[in-house]
UniProtKB/Swiss-Prot annotation:
It comes from the Eukaryota. This is Nuclear cap-binding protein subunit 1. Residues 668-682 have a biased composition (Acidic residues). It holds the Pfam family MIF4G. Component of the cap-binding complex (CBC), which binds cotranscriptionally to the 5'-cap of pre-mRNAs and is involved in various processes such as pre-mRNA splicing and RNA-mediated gene silencing (RNAi). The CBC complex is involved in miRNA-mediated RNA interference and is required for primary microRNAs (miRNAs) processing. In the CBC complex, ncbp-1 does not bind directly capped RNAs (m7GpppG-capped RNA) but is required to stabilize the movement of the N-terminal loop of ncbp-2 and lock the CBC into a high affinity cap-binding state with the cap structure. One of its GO terms (molecular function) is mRNA binding. Disruption phenotype: Lethality in 63% of embryos. It comes from Caenorhabditis elegans. Component of the nuclear cap-binding complex (CBC), a heterodimer composed of ncbp-1 and ncbp-1 that interacts with m7GpppG-capped RNA.
Amino acid sequence: MSRRRQFDDEDEVQMKRRRGAPLIEDVEKKLQGVIGKVGENTGSSIECNLDKLTAFLHDDLEKYRASIIDIIAGCAIYLPNRVTVYTTLVGLLNSKNFNFGGDVVEKLISEQQDLLSKQKYQEAQNLAIFLCDLGNSGVLTAQSIGEYLESFIAAAFEENMPQVRNDYYIQTVLRCLPWIGKELTEKAPEQMENIGEAIGKYLELRNKNHVALLQVWREGSTDQKQEDYLESLSAQIEALRNADWVENHIPRHYSGFETTLQDALQHNLPSFQSPEHTSDMIYPYPLVVFRLFQDADCSAFSSKPLPGDSSIDRFLFEGEIAWIIEKNQFNRKACARELLAFAEENPSVPIGFLIFETIFGQMLRLPHAPYPAIFHCSLVLELLKLKPDDYPQILVQTVECIYRRADSMQPVCIDRMVDWFSFHLSNFQYRYTWTDWKDCLNKDAFSGSQIFVREVIEKCRRFGSYEKIIAALPQDFVKIHPCSPEVRYLIDEEDTALVQRAETFTQMFQERQPAEAFLNELKSNDENDELPYNINEFGLFVMVMLKMASKTYSHNFSALFRYQTTLKTVCDASELYQEKLLETLYSCWKTNQQMLMILTDKLLKMQVIDCSAVVGWLFDEKMWQEHDRQWLFEVLNQALEKLTRQINVVEKDIKELTEKTENKIKEEDDEESDIKMDEDETKEEKFKQDLEDLENNKEKLERMVTFQKGLFNDFLIAFIEEIKNAATSNTSEMDGSGDTPGTQTPKFMWLRGRFCHVLLAHAETLLKHSSNIADEVFSEGTDPSIIECFNQFQSLRL
């Protein structure tokens, strides 16, 4: 953008002023455009643009004061990459109009309190950094900023508060220090010393049980640090302090106006008042820093040094990359362009490596990735398109680094890598140097590397044809080739009676007979049978139906809908029929995992089966053989999540009905005494109906929550039993030596990781019931490492 174009908007505002009074909204839009663009790259320097913008805005301060303050507050919240641009602007305006600076500070404090009450923690943190940086631009005194940060520290030391709340306040202080640390050290050294000591004391006393649970790789299995986020940031701040607060990333535009700003009158920043904690407040989960590359990993591709782990520059670069991604999370093309522009603005650092490290760090973040998987997948593709000479090599290095550590990787992170890499390969005709990974073929079936490669191949099969995938693989990989995804029709041809019954059902399907006919055909003729329908013939009925509908997904859906009444009537009669239905579904579509997953989900949506039947089936001993496969845990988590969503809907209905009835009662209390409720019978009846609905929903919620608790307890007990069984098997599946302790075998470590995966996948629900689970699920014989895993999980919300 040219310098002339930047200030065309200002000229337009001036022309409208001369022509007559413009619409206020038009002027506000122009002001927003002018202020919002001041930090952009233009033909002139940012300092020059700030100087001109200050002169322009000063003329309008009295007329549009509120609008200008609102716009600056918005920039402070949503443009954190331009903090110093806008703090300099406020400083220059404050030097010309002291009251304006005070009004801005008052507005920012009010906005911060509002954001915290709405639990918008990142935005509130952006304002804290902005307020602190106002000390560098001559708006606020260093003494008051020190007191402001000390009030955050005090909030973190309040008694009987969740650790995650206290962590947030300490993190806020640490994040402010790269901007204001030098100023505080020079002008408020005693406060700076107090802040440093208090943070050190807090970190020393803090519970760190959660760290191992949130690490992508098992502790001690890699040379890369997997530090707690607060510990890492504190170490970076300490290194910065020892370097006399010298960093190379923050553009301090106010230094160009030092003479003007140092003579300005300064304001005092009020102390921070932490919002009252309530039980329904949800704070950010603790984080573990993700590191993939060291300087040696980059040396083959770039002569530029990578900032070290303890360097504050690493933190600042990662923060800006993360912000660019957050801002453009709905536009992959714009996101990729801005990331490349950021890399070009910082030629002295191999930003490409930090971009991929940040993307994969987000993709693998525990307990939840911040963005949908498809966004990260498409963003990587877009980056490769825009930088085809460099970024493909960095991506290959990224994949190889992760593959080398796959054996110690959390199962849920392997799942995410499988989802991304299979999608990625589908855009390149599944071409890859597969032979580089043939070492996994000689490892245990439960080793992370073999599971990763096997599941990638299976997922690729879902994206493309079976023949195409097999053709792309080396001959050596036949051991982990997926089976042909065809329906299996397992009927013993020598059993004449069984064949005849199958033919009967086939003919009935062809004649499209109604549900009643099938129900009559399935009725048990055995007087001693306690079940109303013959369970074996029901399994045969399902098998024939699936065989006849096996051509496409649409045929399967059509069959399920056509015979929904038959299926539901039989399955409602006993849980045993639901088990039989799922067992038959598995036996027919065992080699087509995608069909298994889709049809199970469809049966749940149609309410033919319920969540408990699915969970019981998946953790039946007969299904243990599938517990090294990704599809099983996808089905499990979908079923459990479906129940949680149903509970959330009922909770929402209760909240709305409660508000509705309370408002109605309040309205009646506010009415004049001569107006009675019985004068309007319709309102009275509606009010009674709302109260009745509210009570019914409360009872329904209580039943559902009780059912959910029982379901989780039963399933976790079954899972622990399987893990216990794996621990008692002291022989590695591959070497047969019997020298490997049961709790160190790949199978045990994998199942333990899956146990952690389920806890994290349903963290919000399970944390509500964690005390109940601890009492009812764990027994004296439970493996200590499983109890340790659960204790780590509980510490997420300490």
